[in-house]
Each structure stands twice: as structure tokens, then as C-alpha cells.
Amino acid sequence: MLQIGPYPVWPPVVLAPMAGVTNAPFRSLCREFGAGLYVCEMITTRALVAGDPKSRAMMRFEPDEHPRSVQLYGVDPVVVGQAVRLVVEQDLADHIDLNFGCPVPKVTRKGGGSAIPYKRRLFESIVRSAVDQATPHGVPVTVKMRIGIDSDHITYLDAGRIAEDAGVAAVALHARTAIQHYSGQADWETIGRLKQAVTSVPVLGNGDIFAASDALTMMAMTGCDGVVVGRGCQGRPWLFAELAAAFDGRPAPTPPDLRAVAEVMRRHAVLLVAEMGADRGIRELRKHTAWYLRGFAVGSQVRRELGMVASLTELDELIGQLDLDQPYPQAAEGPRGRQGTPQRRVALPHGWLDDPESAAVPHEAELDDGGG
């Protein structure tokens, strides 16, 4: 049984925070299919401390959502500590994850995200600051990171041990380097090596979990204690039902035909509209429609119109034009979401690699907005 601080998590599955995706409606939809730990969108510590209303609005959980899980991004140990203190003292969440895995150039270029673990003292200071504020309130802190900056600057083993010594409740590893972004294949062997190095807290594996069988294979291959699912559930919230069945040893659910997929997509739209209002809610659905319909014979015109859908009524009309008896297509399986190609190099501040022991705070890497 995966244990995150005081919270048992079964099945041992965590929904990775994804900007613009893992809001309260999407988490509710996923939870209708299966249990697990569902993390809300990433929130920046600077914006939270500054009282940014958008950030506070993102930290909304349904009454039956427990534990309430949030991921924070920050580069300054002082600000991170202030943000964590705010969260725990105001009882805004039950679990806090720290983001050290973001590979986006606008973040790493200024010394944030997946660039931070290279600076061991800075990384340790941030983690300890969060743990020190959260522990008295019984709120577990976890970290999510990557293998390293690139193959010449591997950081995950040192970072894992540092985080463990600092008192985190678990360590999650996306088994890619920052330079890979989401391209290529995740190196699951690194998850196994991290599991051998970090012995007192759970180790979670992330990267290329696109089917329930992938999760079982990763855990068997690496010995990790649980899996983190990101892109694999985009347009496929029923993946959590498949994961629950696999971990419970039950037969896999029947893959949904297009009629069932359309019902889930409409349910998602209703939840978004209820949360955000008719206009914004339906706009938020647009990016999901391509994920839901991947592999189905829909037709370019209807697919395009769904990507610009403006109301629930129009959504119903467009769904009515589909051949809803289509079985679930094999083409819908496998990698989904952003993939791209590896960068030629990781954008970093000038001289960033010169001194891995520097604890200097890269203040320019602070993000003022409420999401990543």
C-alpha cells in the first residue's frame, strides 16, 4: 500500500499536475472512474504569497476530495516557506508537492524548474523550508524531479537523497532529462536506481504510462512504490478505471466505443460549465476534444468545429453528427499529448553549471502568475 505521510493511496496512482488540465472538473471526472491521489494545477509560491486571486481560485477542491493535493513551484526558500505556511495555516490542502521537473525554456533559462536540483544547496534549502513549515501541521511534502539537465549533468540520485534527508514523504521521478522534454522514451531503469538509493520513503515513477499494463510493468521492473500519470489520461479519464482494475487483479473494463467517449466528453463539458460559467467552461473543453476523439473516424470538418465549439447546445449538435457505434480504435492507444523533439541544449542562466554548490537564489526565475 502506497503511503504518502498519513494518507494511504490505493491504487498507488497519482494524477500529475498539468497546467490548464487538472482543474477541479477534470479531477472530479477522473475520480468518478477510480481512486488515487489527484493533484491540482501547479501554483507559484510568489503569486500565492502575493495574494493573487487566480492562484487561490485554482486551489479549489470538491467536498469529497481527500486528501486535497497541490503542487507548488518556487525558487526562493523564504518565499516557498511563506507559501507553505499560508497553505497549512489556512487549511488549503492536505498534501504539498514541490515542482523541480519543469523543462520549459522560459523557466530553466532563469534557473527554475528542472535546473534547480543541479544546485544542491539551493535545492536542499527549498525542500527543508517547505518541510519545516508543513510538518508541524501534519501535512506531507513530496518532490517531483527529472533525471537531470542532460546526460552530462545527472542530478536525480543526489537530489533524491537530499530530499529524503530533508524529511519529504515521497520522491517522484520523471525518467527523462530536461533536454528531452517529453520526447523519446522514458528511462525506467533510473527509477529502479532511485528506489535503491532512497530507502526510507516511497519512490514514484513517471514517464510513458499510457496503459494500465505500463504501470504494472514499471512497478515490476523498478520496484517503485507507485506511478504518476500525466499525458496518458488526456482525453482518457477512464484510464483510472483500468488502473484500478489492474491493481486489484480484476478484468480490464471494456474499452469505450465512441458513444461512451462522447458521453464522457459531454460530462466533462457540464462539469467545466458548472465550475467556470458557460462561456469559459466550453472554451476550456476545446483543447480536450482532440484528445477524446483521437483515432476515431470523425471527419476533419466536425473535428475542426469541435475545436471551436461555443456552447453545450452546439456540442450536442456536433456529437449528433458522429457515428457513435464506432468501437474504440487501436490508434487511440500509445503516447498522447505533447512530445516534440529534444532541445539542442537546455536554456540556463550564464554560468549556471559552474558551481553546483551555490545557494544563490535565481530571483528572475520567480513566476508571478498562478500557473505553469
Positions of PLM-derived features:
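N-terminal small/glycine-rich loop or linker at the start of catalytic domains
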Residues: L2-V14, R46-P67, C102-G112, A130, ...
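Active-site mouth loops of central-metabolism enzymes
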Residues: P11-V21, P67-V80, I116-P117, V143-Y156
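Alpha/beta catalytic cores of nucleotide-metabolism and tRNA/nucleoside-modifying enzymes
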Residues: M1, G5, V9-V13, A19, ...
